Amino acid sequence: MPLRRLLRASVPTARLEAVAEEVVHRYGGSSATFEKMEADNWLSVPLVVDDRWFVKVIADQHTLLHGVLTAGRNLGARSSGREGFFEHFSTPVEMADHELDATRAMRELGVDAPEPLAAFDHDGLGVVVLEYLPSFRTLDELSAEEISALAPTLFGHLSRMHGADLAHGDLRAENVLVAPDGDGEVGEVGDPGETGDPDEETLYFIDAARVQAIEDARAYDLACALASLSPHVGADAAVDAALERYPASSLSPAAEFLDFVSLRPDHDFETAAVREAIERAA
């Protein structure tokens, strides 16, 4: 989209080079070479530095846009008769710190996520440094059969977070990664700290907003999960996967957020089909 390209181009290359050099200086890499990643990301410029680190560079314009999107999301939540639960951050480094904390919180719960290394300010830019998963695929790059097999794990991750009174807050296909177990350090859900079999694949969450998981935020997460899965596996199969981790009574509140979620440009699903599948399950 033109606006996204403008935002990505708005951080001069020289400033990105300086960030890459700082990352290598801090972590002892062999080269400050970097590559911009093509990602559906409005709120940072994502880089891969030295083929070792995933770095998100956040500028003032990203913070401003985050404020606009946050206001819109909270307005949308209120239009669904719910309290707004998205938090705005006033500076790039606040956004960076929040993402680092959210990623740490997920891993502490046994939810697979790239290892968080640091968040810092560099010349007014917010910088987040995470481990890089070189062989990852996003959820929408998988086959329907692969998505169907991984759907219970996705809801298992959400259930762990919700059980600890946390929510993801921005669950969509590009924020769900699948990579060989050998790429990361967490392994399967429930076995943090163990490296898995490289012939197997693990589902990772990224970019969690880590909103406080009041009931409405949990319902919103579930609505986003169903919106992400149903185009690939069908509404009934997506709901069935959710029911492996959640009671049917938890899905009814999610149905109230489907119209709101459908307005997001990063979700494209049949709202009526998902709502009907939830009603059948109930």
Language model: regions and residue ranges:
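Terminal disorder- and signal-encoded targeting elements
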Residues: 1-10, 149-150, 157, 183-198, ...
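Juxta-kinase regulatory segment immediately upstream of eukaryotic protein kinase catalytic domains
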Residues: 1-42, 259-275
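A glycine-centered beta->alpha junction motif in the catalytic cores
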Residues: 60, 77-85, 127-144, 210-211
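Conserved kinase catalytic-core helix
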Residues: 96-97, 102-113, 136-174
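Short beta-strand micro-motifs within the conserved protein kinase catalytic domain, predominantly
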Residues: 115-125
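Catalytic activation segment of kinase domains across protein kinase-like and atypical kinase folds
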Residues: 122, 131-132, 137, 167-224, ...
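C-lobe/activation-segment region of protein kinase-like
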Residues: 200, 204-281
